[in-house]
Amino acid sequence: MDSRNVLIIYAVNVERKLNAAAHHTSEYQTKKLVLRRGQIFTLKVILNRPLQPQDELKVTFTSGQRDPPYMVELDPVTSYRSKGWQVKIAKQSGVEVILNVISAADAVVGRYKMRVNEYKAGVFYLLFNPWCSDDSVFMASEEERAEYILNDTGYMYMGFAKQIKEKPWTFGQFEKHILSCCFNLLFQLENNEMQNPVLVSRAICTMMCAANGGVLMGNWTGDYADGTAPYVWTSSVPILQQHYVTRMPVRYGQCWVFSGILTTALRAVGIPARSVTNFESAHDTEKNLTVDIYLDESGKTIPHLTKDSVWNFHVWTDAWMKRQDLPHGYDGWQVLDSTPQEISDGGFRTGPSPLTAIRQGLIQMKYDTTFVFTEVNGDKFIWLVKQNQEREKNILIAVETASLGKKISTKMVGENRREDITLQYRFPEGSPEERKVMAKASGKPSDDKLNSRTLNNSLQISVLQNSLELGAPIYLTITLKRKTATPQNVNISCSLNLQTYTGNKKTNLGVIQKTVQIHGQESRVFLTMDASYYIYKLGMVDDEMVIGGFIIAEIVDSGERVATDTTLCFLYSAFSVEMPSTGKVKQPLVITSKFTNTLPIPLTNIKFSVESLGLANMKSWEQETVPPGKTITFQMECTPVKAGPQKFIVKFISRQVKEVHAEKVVLISK
């Protein structure tokens, strides 16, 4: 053959801008092409001469971190399909050939090498595709796709059910190295497993946790001197970028940080995801669908008996996908949780667990549905432990059937507001459906289950949980209800602790005891504790603290006892931020912040910071101490590097006051 007639590939143009716009991947900060499976993309091939009918033109795609690789070989001349892929010649003009390639809707996701004949055309990423109706992560609503795939900022919801606080969070799934980091973490999957969002999401969930050899190390000790305190993080980006560069675990995280990086990773690879908060979240170590709390007669928790716990809140991630591994009816949202709590198949992970199975009490549906069901549905039993002639006697004094799994929350689609999604997880408390679900999950008849969790107390107790301005005295309003109006003497005992959101008690603040005579069918009792009992202990651990405890009321004549618990979160409002509404790329803008120390103690280890995806780096400013009553003002100059609406988060942090923040969206023009 005349060498002048040999077909030679001079170049392959992957039409990066054109394809990225069509595939909703323009925001990824990588020089490589990013595509979504099941959708057409275009290649422009430059030849040494016009293509002729007898010429052989083959396009080969290979992927996989294990041998043998996943390989697809296509012939645009014949247009035959291979593994669901197809290529066609869309246009031919002289030495230019335009190829339209359609990848399979169930193709392996990950990095691909592309070759046209012997010409190496580079590397691209192939993602799951919620826009493709044949993809198992298909999501029909454009508004939901914009939120759960494309939105790179959002909120975590924290606090407790009666005082929900929002924490701005930057997911940053399009930032530099994030996509590469996510696919690097999937090395343990076989090539064919990379087709399946169930297996990919479970693997990503596993690898977010350093205990499994992954990204983030959990720590709830209050000592974070050799890392970053969990409450300091407001973005997934520095965590995943640090792990990508160092290949070492990042220190430290707690549940909302694990959810943040998991949501980022899932959105990055194309699986719709949302961070979800469950308030009053049960941790049932015995898997008996109850949380058992044991108290002494003053209301103090007995640690060696109390193995279960109730977290003020717990944050996990929901991912959207079809469950082709389960019977019909379990598609849609699935719970995934990277927080290291329980071992599942040899590693710390939870899910994916279908919300429909959780709601129906079908705890046998994989994965880990029993654990999630108890978090949102369990009953809380409070036991009084009495010492009687050197023997302990446990007396059940409270059964709470509606105190766990409250106000399950996520960011609303298209709005910077909280959405309550509790009814996606469970039927209304006390409804016939809820009783049937509890019976199904527990394996007991519904009547038996209902009776076993009912106490016929003549006295009922509740507490009004007010917010607590940091530095103010503690005020508790106890309400006692009964059927009789006969005067009765009642002993009240309230034990309060400074503790973390998981219920981990750092110090006991004291016991308030009071004997009152109640009249009528409803009475109120007021308990107080001076701020000095807690204010000097705020800096003892590097965690955001709450006040929590139990209250026991005893009718003196009959000895009948009832109990309830209380939680108080601190508020601190002496913080203001001023920043412009508009700015320009590469032109400095000034942010001014003021903070007043209203406490009677000095604040130490002060740090102000400004974060935004519109900035090249986080900006920070530090000061050792702010004396009582002192106001400090700082100005920080920031230079935006990205155009468009950019969210700026300004934070104040100290050893005693953990994270006060403000946020504002600034419109940055070119």
Swiss-Prot record:
Note how many cofactor molecules are bound and how. Binds 1 Ca(2+) ion per subunit.
What is the protein's name according to its record? Protein-glutamine gamma-glutamyltransferase 4
Family (UniProt)? Belongs to the transglutaminase superfamily. Transglutaminase family.
- PANTHER family (UniProt xref): PROTEIN-GLUTAMINE GAMMA-GLUTAMYLTRANSFERASE, PROTEIN-GLUTAMINE GAMMA-GLUTAMYLTRANSFERASE 4
Gene giving rise to this polypeptide = Tgm4
The residues responsible for catalysis, as annotated, are: C255, H314, D337
Localization (cell):
Secreted
Coiled coil segments of this chain: none
Question: Taxonomic lineage of this organism?
Answer: Eukaryota, Metazoa, Chordata, Craniata, Vertebrata
